[in-house]
Amino acid sequence: IISIFIFAVGSLQLMAQRDYQEQARAMGIENIEKFKSFLALPNDAAQKEQISANIDWETQELIALDFEVKTLSTSHLPLLLANKIIKKKLPTVAFYLHLDGQAVDLSKWNQDDPYSAELMQKTSQGFESIDWENITNADNEDLRIFARSSADDKGPFAMFLIALEYLKNNNKSPAFNIKLIIDFEEEQSSPGLPQAVKEYKEELLADVLLILDGPMHSSGLPTLVFGNRGIATLTLTTYGPLTSQHSGHYGNYLPNPALALSKVLGSMKDDKGRVLIPGFYSDIFLSDTVKGILEGVPSEEASI
């Protein structure tokens, strides 16, 4: 009896999972035209009028999902801040994402217009464009949507909107308040973001921060990342002759700034990539659990 009960529970869970997957797929297909219209909006951060059109589109979508939306002025392009309060006593989860895209270089694209999404199928020769009617083919795992920002980073935002639409249509609410922080200059290194975080500290406060961006594992499997690499920058200046000198006269006599700099850089890491700068790892501790998780990530060496 116990084994039958366990089997029944397991079957119900599997059926529920399949049901959610089928619903998610159906909603995704229903929203393809909306996604294509979203991708059709150029989003080069160097073109302010393009970003303004994207802000208008996203604002309308979020208001329809009961968000309070406002722009936060920065020293460069504005941020878009959207809040959905479920209950004031609940924790708040902030989601950061960016909706600008890199400038388009048509010579790198195999389609006439990178802002006109195309459905493509993987073949032995790469990817080839196919009719959009094939999007309903549930058995084909080799379909891809090609357009500027289809993955980085409009795709995650579109999925986020569809998930919220599902919850709203089914009278369901998450167990937390939602805060969206949308950046429009990520591809430009977000020059206005650092100061904005300080200036709007109270408005950006949250209990948890999730980032809807970042690379996927080369296996193609959905990837959750529980931490991000930071960055530290500095400027090194090496000195040499006041003006260019002829190597036949002064080669190996005057110091070569490029050689000096290469020696400094070469001294910073060993042959295995470990940083040799004293104190670099002094405040870093990895538990056995974390080490086990990291070691369990499949190797990518063969694919890269």
Give the location of each predicted region.
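Acidic-enriched catalytic cores of C-N bond-cleaving enzymes acting on peptides and small amides
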Residues: 217, 226, 247-304
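Acidic/His- and Gly-rich active-site-bordering loop/insert found
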Residues: 17-148, 167-176
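Predominant activation on well-ordered alpha-helical scaffold segments within soluble catalytic domains
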Residues: 59, 158-161, 194, 259-266
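Flexible glycine/proline-rich, aromatic-decorated loop/lid segments
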Residues: 225-239
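The feature captures the short pre-catalytic strand/loop hairpin that immediately precedes
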Residues: 136-140, 235-248
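Bacterial Sec-dependent N-terminal signal peptides
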Residues: 1-19
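Generic secondary-structure signature for well-ordered alpha-helical cores
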Residues: 63, 169-172, 198, 202, ...
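Acidic/histidine-rich catalytic neighborhood of metal-dependent amide-processing enzymes
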Residues: 141-227
